[in-house]
Amino acid sequence: MLFASDFEDNRVHIDDTHSNQEYYCPYCGAPLVTKKGDIRQHHFAHKQSHVCSDTWANGGSHGYDLSPWHNEWQSLFPKVNQEVKLCLGETKHRADVLVDRTVIEFQHSIMPVKAFDDRNNFYFNLGYKVIWLFDLSDLYSIGQLTYKPINNGLFFTWKNPKKAFNNYDIQSGCI
């Protein structure tokens, strides 16, 4: 997670933290550890074995992506639009990016079909449009994804697309 709350409940980005201050999870209120090493992406983390109330943080419906690919895309948006907390009943989730009434999700890792459906339905039930941006570079490198120029754009062909897209309605943008 890239954002936490300080003692005054202000939203703070990991790169704006100070070592002498405590930061808290915006979902469950638990104290967080700042991870600002030289190897991995800077981020906040719960203390070991803590179970957060953020519905998808604990892998319950697929955990969060901290890949460089994901963070590069997310960082193209203003911080105020990144990792926005959304709630529907007991379900809590942070959208990668929220602009107006549109959620943008960046997906680098493999995602189970149920997790994809759950997230789409969650956003739809809140009245948001969802745009997914998938990292398909691995599929391109093995020939599963091809493209050719057509008119003023590109025509893509995806051999054996994931079954998560079988029930996707292009017109409505819903599952």
Task: Please describe what each predicted stretch is.
Residues 1-10, 16-20, 24, 140-175:
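Non-catalytic C-terminal interaction segments of nucleic acid-processing enzymes
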Residues 2-5, 44, 97-99:
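Short beta-strand element of the conserved SAM-dependent methyltransferase core
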Residues 13-17, 31-35, 68-118, 145-146, ...:
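Active-site metal-binding core of divalent-cation-utilizing nuclease and nuclease-like domains
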Residues 33-38, 56, 60:
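Short Cys/His-rich "knuckle" micro-motifs
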